[in-house]
Amino acid sequence: MKFKKKFYFIVASYFRFFANFAFRRWHPRVIAITGSVGKTTMLNLVECTLGDKAHYSHDANSAYGIAFDMVNLRGVTGSKLRWFYLFLAVPIKSLFYKHKEEFYVVEIDGERPHEAEFLASWLRPEVTLWVSLGLSHACQFEQQVKDGLFSSLDKAITHEFAMLPQYTQKLVIIDGEVDLMNRALDSIKQKNLTKATVIKCSKDAVKTYKVEPNHTSFILQGTADGVSHEYEFNRPMSKDIAIQLTMLETLVNYLEVMPRYDFSNLKLAPGRNSYFDGKNGLKIIDSSYNAHLISVKSILEMYKAMHVPHKWLIIGDIVDQGSIEGQEHAKLADEIIKVKPEQVILIGRRTKKYTAPILKEAGLNIYTTLDPREALKFLEQNLTGQETLLFKGSQYLEWLIEKLLKNPEEAKYLPRREKAAIKRRQKRGLN
């Protein structure tokens, strides 16, 4: 396993070496976005605001993906033979390719130890937006805790993300309501590890929040002028997005660009609170992409705030949790209970083992299965068309949604449409 991790960075260093020629030729103002969840949504908000002034690292947030993006190449999503092409194409394109935009808005993942530092020490962003902190990809950091490098998973993951602020040149924007984030930045400043200004945002700016299956509005008090502004979205958005809107306003003030408040045409990546009309009048909210407790909790709080009858939850397992999967799925049950849903469908061995018993004890109507096909059968037999369905988690929920769409052609807007994902579903008999 250790060799595999070292090999990952050896190969990543090869691609970074060549991609750096294109990066230095371009010399953009780098705006880095990091965090456990919410990075892509933050990137989309920035994109709506800056438009064609920036290049955006869509579908690229790893050491490999960002190197490929630097020379306008896509990573490996299909045949493994593409690796041979990339080993040749990256050096060649690095000799002449150059992005032309003023800004590079780049999403940086902290999925594995040392990756954030690997990217931060290369890109050295002008601005970093650290949007969230939680136990996503916890299994990747367990060895560091076992080796005594950190006393807990929380501290190991915090340390990883904190590498970006250390290498940031001008401005670091964080969620000031997250204690571990605050402590990390206070420590970095006390040790003079960064000269960047640190601005801590909070949800205190929220004056009103209204959410429906296909619409959300916020009224936020401006951080700079104190004037209240209304933000509009044509999809359901969690209240936690207020932190990102406040961060966006802070960024806009720093860059001295025009702010934006109407996000009705905001295009989010698939599986991030997409609204669909379902068969026979069903309302479908697809939030199936991310499956970590921090994101599940946020979406369930949104669902609780939504004034609709007949709330049904379809929940898949939380993945990549390693030894803490039991406690995370027990916490998941507590969050589900707060929503008071009419019906809960749990899919996966983890939700069946850890979540279902707590929900049963609380008196909720639940249906558990390991097979998405059985879940579909239950839905088709029991839905009346008056329900609002929220999908969150793993276990091929995108396949379930596809079968319930009023307009089958809208399946192209669901997550995991790449060939490899389609093949995985087919192997499970999900055609």
PLM features: residue spans?
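ATP-dependent carboxylate-amine ligase
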Residues: 1-11, 15, 26, 51-52, ...
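ATP-dependent carboxylate-amine ligase catalytic core
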Residues: 21-25, 51-159
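Acidic, Mg2+-coordinating active-site environments of NTP-dependent enzymes
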Residues: 26-28, 100-101, 120-284, 308-309, ...
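Short beta-strand segments
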Residues: 32-34, 107, 130-132, 175, ...
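A conserved segment at the C-terminal end of the G1
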Residues: 33, 41-57
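Short catalytic-loop micro-motif centered on adjacent basic/acidic residues
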Residues: 55-56, 103-107, 172-174, 284-286, ...
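Short, acidic/turn-prone active-site loops that include or flank metal/cofactor-
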Residues: 59-62, 132-135, 203-206, 368-375, ...
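Short beta->alpha connector loops
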Residues: 109-113, 178-179, 290-291, 372-373
